[in-house]
């Protein structure tokens, strides 16, 4: 089950009480105080685990508390520190307290202290003085800290797929990555985001994210899109997947409406580097004319695709992709316009190299 938002209560442990005791030895009638200090309460940590990509483990477990410190002992023995509470979360988890961002947990294996445990109380040995040789007082341990927090998951991926329902995003990610999403010939097959690892060669690869299809009004809460648009906010490059075979809505209109929804949701998201994939090109007779017209619409110089062993359709590759220059993360024009077919794997192998090269 994919869960990307939960509310939990976290609490550090209470400090253990100090001990009231006196030294008892043979031939010593009134030994001095030897009460030990209480142990500190356990701390609460968040730890990032790369082996999970959901917050589902928190369903049904609302309270997460560290252990209390142990009481001090006799003979100046300090109590044991309370056991820490380690809360494991996937990369990309944001922790909100009082509706304000408190922690942003991104790096795998990162461990961040959230709450410090209460200090253990001092034993009566600390309170001996010239006028008080037999103190019968020891401190209580300090209380721990309790906090109600909201965990929000924003998946971390290099490439984010954006498109209308049934555009072929799930088929594409299943073709070029290790992801195995549900695929069917109807809209809204994808109900949760999918992450896939794309292996380009033995040394190179990247992460791709596919979110449920966006519909008009997604930025205002319609459909499933707004719930998951946040999962592509961290991506480095967006790939608009357009259905070239669709008769009721042309590729220019698809692109314009998708971009409008992104701009409404987040201007920063809409300004990310991007490319365009003209999917289902194998069932379109005039794909070259369609690509030529679309490139003109984006003010791009159409070209015959030859690099990366692409099929020789008309399309566009930014000069950065076919040179040794590094990509500009602030590039505003499209990085690529590629006809492909996810079903027949047409240009999908070459797409891996194009996307890898497109990453800043």
From Swiss-Prot:
Keyword GTP-binding: yes
Sorted UniProt keywords: Cytoplasm, GTP-binding, Hydrolase, Magnesium, Metal-binding, Nucleotide-binding
UniProt binding sites for GTP: 163-170, 188-192, 210-213, 279-282, 341-343
Keyword Ribonucleoprotein among UniProt keywords: no
Domain OBG-type G span(s) in chain numbering: 157-360
Location of the protein in the cell: Cytoplasm
GO cellular component: cytoplasm
One GO-annotated biological process of the protein: ribosome biogenesis
Known EC number: 3.6.5.-
Every Obg domain range: 1-156
Cofactor(s) listed: Mg(2+)
Function: An essential GTPase which binds GTP, GDP and possibly (p)ppGpp with moderate affinity, with high nucleotide exchange rates and a fairly low GTP hydrolysis rate. Plays a role in control of the cell cycle, stress response, ribosome biogenesis and in those bacteria that undergo differentiation, in morphogenesis control.
The protein's assembly and partners: Monomer.
Family named by the database record: Belongs to the TRAFAC class OBG-HflX-like GTPase superfamily. OBG GTPase family.
Protein known as: GTPase Obg
Organism in which the protein naturally occurs: Helicobacter pylori (strain G27)
């Amino acid at each position: 089950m994919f869960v990307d938002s939960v509310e939990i209560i976290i609490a550090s442990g209470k400090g253990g009480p100090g001990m009231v005791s006196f030294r008892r030895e043979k031939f010593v009638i009134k030994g001095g105080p030897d009460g030990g200090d209480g142990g500190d309460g356990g701390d609460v940590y968040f730890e990032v685990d790369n082996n999970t990509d959901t917050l589902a483990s928190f369903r049904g477990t609302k309270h997460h508390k560290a252990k209390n410190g142990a009481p001090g002992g006799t003979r100046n023995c300090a109590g044991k520190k309370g056991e820490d509470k380690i809360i494991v979360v996937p990369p990309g988890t944001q922790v909100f307290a009082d509706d304000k961002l408190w922690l942003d947990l991104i790096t795998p294996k990162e461990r961040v202290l959230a709450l410090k445990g209460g200090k253990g109380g001092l034993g009566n040995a600390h309170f001996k003085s010239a006028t008080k040789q037999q103190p019968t007082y020891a401190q209580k341990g300090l209380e721990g800290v309790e906090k109600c927090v909201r965990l929000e998951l924003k998946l971390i991926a290099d490439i984010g797929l954006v498109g209308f329902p049934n555009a072929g995003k799930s088929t594409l990610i299943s073709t070029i990555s290790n992801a195995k999403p549900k695929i069917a010939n109807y809209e809204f097959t994808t109900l949760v985001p999918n992450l896939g690892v794309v292996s380009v060669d033995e040394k190179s690869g990247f992460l791709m994210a596919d979110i449920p299809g966006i519909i008009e009004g997604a930025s205002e809460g319609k459909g499933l899109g707004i719930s998951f648009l946040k999962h592509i906010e961290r991506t480095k490059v967006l790939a608009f997947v357009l259905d070239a075979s669709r008769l009721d809505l042309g590729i220019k209109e698809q692109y314009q409406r998708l971009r409008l929804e992104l701009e409404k949701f987040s201007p920063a998201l809409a300004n990310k580097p991007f490319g365009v994939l003209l999917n289902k090109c194998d069932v379109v007779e005039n794909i070259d004319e369609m690509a030529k017209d679309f490139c003109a619409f984006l003010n791009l110089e159409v070209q015959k695709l030859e690099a990366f062993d692409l099929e020789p359709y008309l399309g566009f590759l930014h000069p950065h992709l076919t040179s040794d220059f590094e990509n500009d993360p602030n590039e505003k024009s499209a990085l690529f316009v590629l006809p492909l077919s996810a079903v027949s794997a047409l240009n999908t192998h070459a797409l891996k190299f194009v996307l890898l090269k497109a990453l800043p």
